[in-house]
Amino acid sequence: MPKFVVMLRVKDGMFFVAEWLQCFEKLADEIVVLDNGSTDGTYESLKAHPKVVDIVRTEGYNEGRDKNLLYEHTRRRNPDWILWVDIDEVFEPNLTRKHFDRLMKRSFVNKYAFRRFHFIDRENFAGSWFRLNYSAGHDRIMWREASSGYFENFILDSPNVKGIKGLKVNTNFRLKHMGYISKDIVDRKKDLYLGLIADEKKESLNEMYLSNEKPIKWVDDRNHPRVILLNGLLNCIQARHIADKVVSRTKSFLINRFRKPTTQNATAINS
């Protein structure tokens, strides 16, 4: 069977550690961790788990540096497939290793993508139209390891792995993002990010508090009619976004293709 390794970058995630390990110990063959200076027992708890086969520590906030270092250590485990997630993200509980084995055995697919749902408490996720539009996208990736893979070297918000070629398939596997359920945790994130982002973007940090959100009750059963209907709605939203992008790019291409040359360009052509 393919070797599946989960990579985790974390700082002071003790609030989520037990739940996270309960999820990924049943899915991953191995877990590789980068701890960015935890002081709350996170490092010790993760290091003690038998599935955690490597753990490295850094100081100072730099996501790009850390993810590339973590990727380097993960590659030493000779994985066939890799998944990067945060400590506050867990899959829906009904998913098993067999679900992932079925994905990994498809030789023509190199990437699988998963949706995240942003929880406002332990039982409800954010259901405003803005948040549903966000969840409609598949923003977590599991990939077949390749030497071309890398993470962009951004201090903040270094996104998913880059450089992995081949077919990507969106799945209906759901990730529960629990990072907003504790105000204390959101406060600490906001204080950290305030020192790292431009002034004009600082107001957007208030969105992390998920205030005035419409709560939607989470249902664990993947085959429940409400879950099937929700996935259908999100698929429609995503299809609309894709159609909008196609129209926009086609329009831009046609405008550039048939735009009349400027006077300067026309003079250059005539000369």
Predicted regions and their residues:
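Active-site nucleotide-sugar/metal-binding loop of Leloir-type enzymes
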Residues: N68-W81
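Short, conserved SAM-binding/catalytic segment
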Residues: K47-V53
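A short, glycine-/small-residue-rich helix N-cap motif at loop->alpha-helix starts
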Residues: F15, E59-K67
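Catalytic-site signature of metal-activated, phosphate-bearing donor transferases
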Residues: R65-Y71, P93-S271
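Short beta-strand-to-loop acidic/aromatic patch adjacent to the donor-nucleotide binding site
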Residues: P79-E92
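Short, well-formed alpha-helical segments that are part of the catalytic scaffolds
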Residues: M7-L27
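A conserved acidic beta->alpha catalytic loop
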Residues: D35-S45, G60-N62
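Cell-envelope/extracellular polymer assembly enzymes that use nucleotide-activated donors
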Residues: K3-V5
